[in-house]
Amino acid sequence: MKSDADWDAVIVGAGTGGAAAAYGLCQRGMSVLLLDAGPRFDPVVDYPLTESNWDTRDFPEKAGSVGSVTFAPGQKLIGVEPLLVSGSKGLGLLVTSGTRWMEKYHHVRGIGGTTLHFTGESHRLHPDAMKMKSRFGVAADWPFDYAELEPFYMRAEELIGVAGPPFQGARWRSRGFPLPPHPLSYAARTLGRGAAALGLDWQANSRAALSLPWHGRPNCNYCGGCNMGCPRGDKGSADVTFVAAALATGRCIVRPNSPVLRIEAGIGDRVTAVLVGHPDGTIERIPSPHLILACGAVETPRLLLASDGLANESGEVGQNFMDTLEVIVGALHPDPQHGRRGLPDDAICWDFNAPDAIPGVIGGCRIFNASGENELRGLSGFALRAVSGWGRAHAQSVRRLWGHSLHVGAIGESLPNRNSRVDLDPDQHDQFGIPLSRISAWLDESDIGRLRFMAAKSRELLAASGAQEIFESYSSWDWFGATHVFGTCRMGADPTISVVNAAGRNHRWRNLWITDASVFPSSGGGEAPSLTIHALSLRTADKIGKDD
C-alpha cells in the first residue's frame, strides 16, 4: 500500500457509487483514498431493534450523518386530485398549505451512504428506458445501451449476493441471479391473488438481502428493519460489500468525517487537489491524480458549483434534476395479513414499467407490496394512522384491526424539466462558509398524469385483493420526499448539453470523473437505482487511467 501522500485516485463519497468505484480500482491494482463527509456506522451498536421506540423511529442519526439542504418554494397545487392527496384516517391531511410540501432530502452521510438506510431493492433498468429521446422524444438517451452495462450488473450482483427470480421480462440476463428469491410473505401472496385476478404478473422482488449465506455474511432473518439499518450485515449496503472488499485488497484507505469543500484545478486539463475541512476549522489539501466524485445528485453539483463552477462549461451542472414519483396506499383487509412479517417490499409487478406502458403518458412505473415503504412498523404507528377516535372505542378498534393492513406502492418515471434543478443557496451556508445546495423540484402535467395512473392501479390492486377500507394514501403530488434523485451532471456524447462523457469523465478535465446518479440521463420507470449506480461505477473504474 502506498503512503497517505501517494495514491492513484481520490474518491469523494463512500456510498453507492464511490464504494463500487473504489472496489473496481483496487481490483485493478490501483491505490485509493476514499473520503466521506459522514461517520462510520457500527451495525451492532448503531442499529438496535429492541428499543421502546423501534416502531416509530427512522434511521439513526450520528454526528455528521445528516447534511443540510434548502428548498426553493414549493409548487402551487392546482385543481382537485382526490386520489393524490396525502393523508391518513387517524392524522388527517398531510398538506394544507396549498403548495407542495418539501419535506426533506432523505440522504445518509457516512461510510456506506444511503445504502445504509435503503430497503435493499436491486433492479436493472429497462433497456428501452435508456433510449428515451430517440424512441420517445423526451429526456435524453444514455450514450450506450443495456448490453454495454449488463456485464457490470452481473459483477455487482455477484459481489452483493442479490436474490431474485429467474425471469424479469425485458431485463435479459447473461446468467441467473446469484441467489434464489426470498419466499413471499402472507401479505404479498394475498396481493398476488389480486394481481392474478387483474391479469397482472406478480413476482418476487430482486433484493440485495441474502436468501442464503454469502461470502461470509449470514442470510436474512426477516426482522423487517431494513430501513433502520441492518444489524446482521445480510442487507447488501455498500459498507459490508464494496467497501469491505476494497479494504480487503490492502489498497484502499477510508477516511470518514472528511467533508470536501472545494476542488482545485490546474492550468492545463487536470484537476490537482481537493480541500478537506476539519471540525477545528483547519483545511487540508489532498492531491488527486484522479478525482472521482460520488456525492449523489444533490451534493456533487454543489461541490462543482462551489468550486467556481468547475466542469460547468455546458451550463448543465445542477440542471435536469429528477426525483422519482411515488404513491403509497394503505387499506384494511377483513382477514389478518401480518403485513410486517417477511421481507419488506418482497413482491413486484413490472407490467407498466416500459416507457410506453401507461396510456397517454411517456414514462413507466412499477407496483409493489409496500410493506417497507409504508414505515408502519408496529402498533404505535397503526394506532395513530389507521384508526380514528379516542378512548376505549379507539383502543378496541386498534385491537380488532391490528395486523389487517395491506399497502400497495407505485414508483414511476420522473422526466427532467428546466424548473427542477440543484443550485447554490445565496443565503444559507455550512460551518465552513460553503453555500448549501438548494433543491427546486417541479411536476409537469405528464408527471401528474403518471401519478394518477399509479394511484388508480394501486387502489385497484388492493380492491382485487379483498381490501375494503383505505385508511391512508401518500403521493408525490403534494409531497416531495426524495425517493430517488438523479440527473444533475448528465452523461452524453455532446459536451454542449452534458457534463461527463460515456465513460463518466468530464468533457473538460481529463482526470475528473463522476460515479453517482447525477450522471443518469433518465430515471427509469421506477427501478431502484443502486444497482445501476454500482454497475456504472464499476464500468467507469475499468476505464480510469487507461489512456493518460
PLM regions: where:
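N-terminal glycine-rich phosphate/pyrophosphate-binding loop and immediately adjacent elements
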Residues: 2-133, 138, 143-147, 151-154, ...
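Conserved redox-cofactor binding core of oxidoreductases
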Residues: 58-88, 92-104, 109, 119-124, ...
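A conserved FAD-binding loop/helix module that cradles the flavin
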Residues: 522-541
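FAD cofactor-binding and catalytic pocket of flavoenzymes
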Residues: 85-114, 118, 142-146, 314-437, ...
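Short phosphate-binding/catalytic loops that engage adenosine nucleotides
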Residues: 30, 200, 467
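Glycine-rich loop(s) and the adjacent beta-strand/alpha-helix scaffold that form part
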Residues: 27, 31, 38-58, 249, ...
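A glycine-rich dinucleotide-binding beta-alpha-beta segment and adjacent secondary-structure elements
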Residues: 92, 204-211, 219-226, 256, ...
